[in-house]
Swiss-Prot record:
Family per record: Belongs to the PMG family.
UniProt KW keywords: Keratin, Repeat
Annotated protein name in UniProt: Keratin-associated protein 14
Tissue specificity remark: Expressed at high levels in skin where it is found predominantly in the keratogenous zone of hair follicle cortical cells and at lower levels in the epithelium of the developing mammary gland.
Biological role: In the hair cortex, hair keratin intermediate filaments are embedded in an interfilamentous matrix, consisting of hair keratin-associated proteins (KRTAP), which are essential for the formation of a rigid and resistant hair shaft through their extensive disulfide bond cross-linking with abundant cysteine residues of hair keratins. The matrix proteins include the high-sulfur and high-glycine-tyrosine keratins.
Highest taxon of source: Eukaryota
InterPro entries (UniProt xref): KRTAP_PMG
UniProt subunit comment: Interacts with hair keratins.
Annotated region described as 2 X 17 AA approximate tandem repeats, given as residue ranges: 98-131
Length: 167
C-alpha cells in the first residue's frame, strides 16, 4: 500500500505524554523529527522507561495516509530499539539527505537530516556523515531509519518496515 500524500490533523501521543498536535505533513514540523511507517498494525512499544526519561514523544498519524507515522522527539531516541541508554541528548548529526512524500515534495528535517522516501517511489539511502551508505528494499517501499544520540556510525542501524509491526 503506497502512501502518496500526507496531510491532515494529528493529535495522539505515546505513553501518556503531553499531546503535541501537528496540523499537516510538511515543513511545519519541528527540527527533531523521526519518520517511520508501519504497514499493518499500530505502534505497540512501551515508552516512558528510563530510556526515554525526560523526552517528549509524540505519535502523528495522517488521517488520509494511514501507513505514515511521524514521531517528534526532542531527545531523538529510537522508539523500537533498546540499545542506547543514558541521559537524553540531542542527536548529533548522524544522517544526511532529504525526505520526500510520494513522488514530489522533498524536504530536509532534523535528526541530522534523514533521507527517506514514501510512496510508489519510496526508498531509503542513509549515510553516517561520510560515504557509509545503506539501502533497504522491502517489497512495499516503506522504510524507517534509526537515529541514535551518538556520532558513531557503529551506533546506526537500519530496519525495514515489513511484516506486522515495530521491532
Amino acid at each position: 500500500m503506497s502512501c502518496n500524500s500526507c496531510s491532515g490533523t494529528f493529535s495522539q501521543s505515546f505513553g501518556g505524554q503531553l499531546q503535541y498536535p501537528i496540523s499537516s505533513c510538511g515543513s511545519s514540523y519541528p527540527n527533531n523529527v523521526f519518520y517511520s511507517t508501519d504497514l499493518q498494525t499500530p505502534i505497540t512499544h512501551q515508552l516512558g522507561s528510563s530510556l526515554h526519561s525526560g523526552c517528549q514523544e509524540t505519535f502523528c498519524e495522517p488521517t488520509n495516509c494511514q501507513t505514515a507515522y511521524v514521531v517528534s522527539r526532542p531527545c531523538q531516541r529510537p522508539f523500537y530499539s533498546q540499545r542506547i541508554r543514558g541521559p537524553c541528548r540531542p542527536c548529533q548529526s548522524t544522517f544526511s539527505g532529504s525526505l520526500g512524500f510520494g513522488s514530489r515534495g522533498f524536504q530536509s528535517f532534523g535528526c541530522g537530516y534523514p533521507s527517506q522516501g514514501f510512496g510508489s517511489h519510496g526508498f531509503q539511502s542513509v549515510g553516517c556523515g561520510t560515504p557509509t551508505f545503506s539501502s533497504l528494499n522491502c517489497g512495499s517501499s516503506f522504510y524507517r531509519p534509526t537515529c541514535f544520540s551518538t556520532k558513531s556510525c557503529q551506533s546506526v542501524s537500519y530496519q525495514p518496515t515489513c511484516g506486522t509491526g515495530f521491532f
